[in-house]
């Protein structure tokens, strides 16, 4: 059975990926690691094996990997897009310094390394519709710059040293468990909370601004799927486009109204996040992921909306 380490385990994806990996591989085969003290974390992370570690501390991370004979690492440490614009130097240090440390350790210890890229790796010159797997990127955010550099680093370490690097380009991720963490696509999570609590939402992204989105169950499916895939089928290896649904604010509002008929929405545009959103594609072409490792999402906008409202209503309203 695989021994798996998840670094950045307390983030939006990690906090849900860890329980899912433990369900699949067994609680004792999945180690969660994060900078935070265990007392700050959800029981789902610390009930199993947990190690406190800074990804920039190479010796500490290497010690953990050796201690548990780790076969696969999911690297989920990152400062997200809007936070990265406020702290660009820190974004570079964490996003790329942490990745470089893991790549160097992987070169020595020979484990699989999953590092996600993002829709944020694209820029204004990128084709907006059905964005190809291989195309011009040229992002305009520091987050995007670190993601493109990360894609290239992972390719380099595979070609130069044979490190088994794998990854996908995630769209905006929508979760019913974890709160948003400073991303441009966070409106598509916030809107459900406000719809349930206030039946109204003030949106910071303009009407008509399309972005690729994905429900968390499909996000986990993509991460685990590419790590379990037969790499002999790969033409690409890192940064596979994975898509699920593309919508703009009016469409998500309409989907919510099907469940909460008196829901209303107005706008107060955030120029920083709007500018980032406009630089990204409307929809990615994920045909390479479908062909090379059988990627297929399970949720569309309506089925996700029904599930989000059902789950969040129980939690927020005790229904």
Predicted regions and their residues:
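NAD(P)-dependent short-chain dehydrogenase/reductase
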Residues: 155-210, 216-221
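Rossmann-fold cofactor-recognition segment
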Residues: 45-56
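N-terminal Rossmann NAD(P)H-binding glycine-rich loop of SDR-like oxidoreductase domains
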Residues: 4-24
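Active-site helix of classical SDR
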Residues: 146
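NAD(P)H-binding glycine-rich loop region in Rossmannoid oxidoreductase-like domains
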Residues: 55-94
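SDR active-site strand-loop-helix element
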Residues: 7, 33, 73-79, 113-119, ...
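Conserved Rossmann-fold NAD(P)-dependent oxidoreductase catalytic core, especially the SDR/UDP-sugar
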Residues: 75, 100-142
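C-terminal substrate-binding subdomain of Rossmann-fold SDR/epimerase-dehydratase oxidoreductases
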Residues: 204-206, 211-319
């Amino acid at each position: 059975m695989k021994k798996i380490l998840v670094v950045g385990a307390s983030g939006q994806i990690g906090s849900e990926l860890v329980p899912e990996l433990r369900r699949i591989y067994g609680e004792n085969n999945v180690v969660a690691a994060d900078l935070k003290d265990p007392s700050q974390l959800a029981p789902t992370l610390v009930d199993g094996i947990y190690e406190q570690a800074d990804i920039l501390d190479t010796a500490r991370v290497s010690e953990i990997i050796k201690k548990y004979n780790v076969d696969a690492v999911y690297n989920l440490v990152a400062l997200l897009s809007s936070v990265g614009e406020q702290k660009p130097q820190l974004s570079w240090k964490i996003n790329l310094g942490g990745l470089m440390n893991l790549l160097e350790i992987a070169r020595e210890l020979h484990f699989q390394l999953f590092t996600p890229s993002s829709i944020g790796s694209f820029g204004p010159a990128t084709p907006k519709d059905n964005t190809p797997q291989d195309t011009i990127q040229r992002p305009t955010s520091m987050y995007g710059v670190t993601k493109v550099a990360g894609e290239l680093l992972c390719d380099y370490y595979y070609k130069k040293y044979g490190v088994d690097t794998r990854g996908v380009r995630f769209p905006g991720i929508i979760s019913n468990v974890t709160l948003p963490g400073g991303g441009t696509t966070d409106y598509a999570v916030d809107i459900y909370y406000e719809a349930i609590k206030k039946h109204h939402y003030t949106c910071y992204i303009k009407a008509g601004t399309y972005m690729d989105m994905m429900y968390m169950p499909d996000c986990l499916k993509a991460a685990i799927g590419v790590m379990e895939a037969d790499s002999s089928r790969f033409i690409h290896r890192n940064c596979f486009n994975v898509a699920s649904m593309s919508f703009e604010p009016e469409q998500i509002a309409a989907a919510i109204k099907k469940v909460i008929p008196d829901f209303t929405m107005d706008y107060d545009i955030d120029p920083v996040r709007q500018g980032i959103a406009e630089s990204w594609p409307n929809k990615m072409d994920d045909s390479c992921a479908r062909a090379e490792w059988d990627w297929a999402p399970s949720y569309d906008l309506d089925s996700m909306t029904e599930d989000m409202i059902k789950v969040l209503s129980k939690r927020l309203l005790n229904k």
